[in-house]
């Protein structure tokens, strides 16, 4: 889901580099193909019967069981612009993200800029219709938010391996001039059934930067992961440093099973974030506590850069299975929510960011 745009000056937009596909597109980026995007009748496979969502949920794109070239689009994933898709010739299942065709250049620009990386998902095929853009991704096996929520946190030995993959993906994006902006646990999904390998789900909401200046002016983030500088009155902020703050929130949540800053009232939540004070849970090793503090620095310039995270001792050592006692976890009131809640802000909260 897209991050909630925060209140900002109307005359200032996100800085993105114009894309010229012929010159800048990566050699391994799927070639854009043009297709008809009107529904085509065709038999539905009996092994994957569609479960159509309510008609009101089908906006803005396509009806369920729509034939699209060699694919059939099945039901829409709740609360997103993604659909289950079946590749008929092979029977392989994919995830298809659908956008207005007018957004094709902006949506594909980050993929054209970014070289292939093992922890960043890449489209397997891109189809452009007269009205809509269809981007197909390999099917994944759940997201990190769901894993942390179900287990109320994960032990350091496991978290270190997963977080190393997350930091590697972000460092790769930053190295090649992408600011991700909407970083959260839900954006990282498992590429294998064993749920040991992570990929950044997509580059939606990423900004393509020009030069070394990563300043952004638009206020764009998720409530639980937003950095204090975005909530301040400063006209601009470092996009890369804001991404690092979000990584710090993610790491804290993975280890503690709760957010470092939480309140049911958004205004109070943002006040806690602005103050930048949080309590680390008991049971964490000294290197883990050190890394969290290096990421959740109130002053953006004092935070580690993404590449520096990979050099931190906590990610370079052998880990014992260190985790907070189960009795402490049951008493925590700031657990990761069962539903979207803070990760997917309602429109009514938008004005509270300013």
UniProtKB/Swiss-Prot annotation:
Q: Where is the Protein kinase domain?
A: 68-315
Q: Name one GO biological process term.
A: regulation of MAP kinase activity
Its keywords, alphabetically, are: Apoptosis, Nucleus, Protein kinase inhibitor, Transcription, Transcription regulation
Query: According to the UniProt entry, which residue ranges have a biased composition of type Basic and acidic residues?
Result: 320-333
Span list, region Disordered: 36-61, 320-354
Q: Where is the composition biased (Acidic residues)?
A: 341-354
Does the UniProt entry include the keyword Acyltransferase?
no
Q: Locations of Pro residues compositional bias? A: 41-55
Which one of the record's GO molecular function terms can you name?
Answer: ubiquitin protein ligase binding
Q: Which domain of life is it from?
A: Eukaryota
InterPro entries xref list: Kinase-like_dom_sf (IPR011009), Prot_kinase_dom (IPR000719), Tribbles/Ser_Thr_kinase_40 (IPR024104)
Q: Which parts of this chain are annotated as the region Interaction with DDIT3/CHOP?
A: 1-127
Any GO CC annotation of this UniProt entry: nucleus
Q: In which tissues is it expressed?
A: Highly expressed in liver. Not detected in heart, brain, spleen, lung, skeletal muscle, kidney or testis.
Q: Does the keyword Metal-binding apply?
A: no
Up-regulation conditions: In liver under fasting conditions and by thapsigargin. Expression is activated by ATF4 in response to stress.
Question: Where found?
Answer: Nucleus
By its UniProt entry, which SUPFAM superfamilies does this protein fall under?
Answer: Protein kinase-like (PK-like)
Q: What is known of its domains?
A: The protein kinase domain is predicted to be catalytically inactive.
Oligomer status and interactors: Interacts with AKT1, AKT2, MAP2K1 and MAP2K7. Interacts with ATF4. Interacts with DDIT3/CHOP and inhibits its interaction with EP300/P300. Interacts with APOBEC3C. Interacts (via N-terminus) with APOBEC3A. Interacts with RELA.
Q: Which family does it belong to?
A: Belongs to the protein kinase superfamily. CAMK Ser/Thr protein kinase family. Tribbles subfamily.
Q: What does this protein do?
A: Inactive protein kinase which acts as a regulator of the integrated stress response (ISR), a process for adaptation to various stress. Inhibits the transcriptional activity of DDIT3/CHOP and is involved in DDIT3/CHOP-dependent cell death during ER stress. May play a role in programmed neuronal cell death but does not appear to affect non-neuronal cells. Acts as a negative feedback regulator of the ATF4-dependent transcription during the ISR: while TRIB3 expression is promoted by ATF4, TRIB3 protein interacts with ATF4 and inhibits ATF4 transcription activity.
What name is this protein filed under? Tribbles homolog 3
Q: What organism is this sequence from?
A: Mus musculus (Mouse)
Q: Which gene encodes it?
A: Trib3
């Amino acid at each position: 889901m897209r991050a909630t745009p925060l209140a900002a000056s109307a005359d200032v937009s996100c800085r993105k580099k114009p894309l010229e596909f012929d010159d800048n597109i990566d050699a391994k980026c799927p070639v854009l193909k043009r297709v008809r995007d009107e529904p085509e009748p065709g038999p539905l496979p009996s092994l994957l019967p569609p479960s159509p969502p309510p008609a009101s949920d089908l906006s803005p794109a396509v009806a369920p069981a729509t034939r699209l070239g060699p694919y059939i689009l099945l039901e829409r994933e709740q609360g997103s612009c993604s659909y289950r898709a079946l590749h008929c010739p092979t029977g392989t299942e994919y995830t298809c993200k659908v956008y207005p065709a007018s957004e094709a250049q902006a949506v594909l620009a980050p993929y054209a800029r970014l070289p292939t990386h093992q922890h960043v998902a890449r489209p397997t095929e891109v189809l452009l219709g007269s009205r809509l853009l269809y981007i197909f991704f390999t099917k994944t096996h759940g997201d990190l938010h769901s894993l942390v929520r179900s287990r109320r946190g994960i032990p350091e030995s496991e978290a270190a391996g997963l977080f190393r993959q997350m930091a590697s993906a972000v460092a790769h994006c930053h190295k090649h001039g992408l600011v991700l902006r909407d970083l959260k646990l839900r954006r990282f999904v498992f590429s294998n059934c064993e749920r040991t390998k992570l990929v950044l789900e997509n580059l939606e909401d990423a900004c393509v930067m020009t030069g070394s200046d990563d300043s952004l002016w638009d206020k764009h983030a998720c409530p639980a992961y937003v950095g204090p500088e975005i909530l301040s009155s400063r006209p601009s902020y470092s996009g890369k440093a804001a991404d690092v703050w979000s990584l710090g929130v993610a790491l804290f949540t993975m280890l503690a099973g709760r957010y470092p800053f939480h309140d049911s009232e958004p205004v109070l939540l943002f006040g806690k974030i602005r103050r930048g004070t949080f309590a680390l849970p008991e049971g964490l090793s000294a290197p883990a506590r050190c890394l969290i503090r290096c990421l959740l620095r109130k002053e953006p310039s004092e935070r580690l850069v993404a590449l520096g995270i990979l050099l931190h001792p906590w990610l370079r050592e052998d880990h014992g299975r260190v985790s907070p006692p189960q009795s402490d976890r049951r008493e925590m009131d700031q657990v990761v929510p069962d539903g979207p809640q803070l990760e997917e802000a309602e429109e009514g909260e938008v004005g509270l960011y300013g």
